[in-house]
Amino acid sequence: MVKKNFLMTAPLLMASFCSAQEKPNVVLIMVDDMGYSDIGCYGGEILTPNIDALASKGVRFTQFYNTSRSCPARASLMTGLYQHQAGIGQMSEDPFKQENQKSPNDWGVPGYKGFLNRNCVTIAEVLKEGGYHTYMAGKWHLGMHGEEKWPLQRGFERFYGILAGACSYLRPSGGRGLTLDNTKLPTPEAPYYTTDAFTDYAIRFVDEQKDDKPFFLYLAFNAPHWPLQAKEEDIQKFTKIYREKGWDEIREARRKRMTKMGIIDSSTEFAEWENRKWDELTEQEKDKVAYRMAVYAAQVHCVDYNVGKLLDYLKKNHKLDNTLVMFLSDNGACAEPYAELGGGKVSEINDPACSVFPSYGRAWAQVSNTPFRKYKCRSYEGGIST
């Protein structure tokens, strides 16, 4: 949910924080490739009680826009600039680039270098100068080849997470592995799950703070971006509903709830459906694709649990009342590789060795983006409205 006018006024907003008599803490929580209607407070059936409670006490934006893709949206969010001005007009650096090899995402012009340039300052750099502690946990995706591009060199005091754009939730490794501050980490031992670990480190950074200065915490989950990997107990909460109802009924139920909530008005029409109707699928296809959606929903549900864990920590430590909390997504739901029934094999779901596909597919992505057209990487509402 990267709103254009927020981004363009972000430095001014941060400056006002820095001059305030009682500076608020700022917690910025970003999810990855989540659709407009996925969470409960926007009409979704996915169980997100903590995010819903946060929304009920705050402000929900219904026309909040982004750049339609992960790293350009993050570049704008961190700098308050159009993504080309910051150097990431299309994609960030390839995690598997060889040493002394030019990144395929460096197009040789300033707007398409694939990493944050030095013609911009980040929110973290501005807030740090204004007396804030600055912490980050999660997905960076703003440059990785050379420490000068890493979070600690762009204003953050502490960092734990991935520099790349995606990883295995269960065993991040290699070019998609973990980094703590400026140190690459070995592959973690099982049991491990990125959503939990990122939240634990975010809490740890705040908890280790020795003074009473305000803090800026950027918690950037890699969920629910592919690969489909979730805890079995969470998956089981959703398998029945998607198999029994299917995507046509789920989509219509979301539209009705969104209308009742005032997210959309009663005259809003669905974008044209680009897939088969649920009843046109074979029973085997229904089984497989319903399971994919259940895993996706479980990923979102785990994010909600961890949002609750962070908020509980802040409340118990008397920090919540003076904390501005923002929850947003980098872009719309992802249909990659644009196959109706999803990418990769069902047997690859929850394989720790997978750091890319499997994914949940074009049809469920369109449900996630109810009532909009298209998906991530497209300049339609389904890509840019989150």
Protein language model features and the residues they cover:
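Hydrophobic h-region of N-terminal signal peptides that target proteins for export
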Residues: P11-S19
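Formylglycine-dependent sulfatase
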Residues: V2-K3, C18-T386
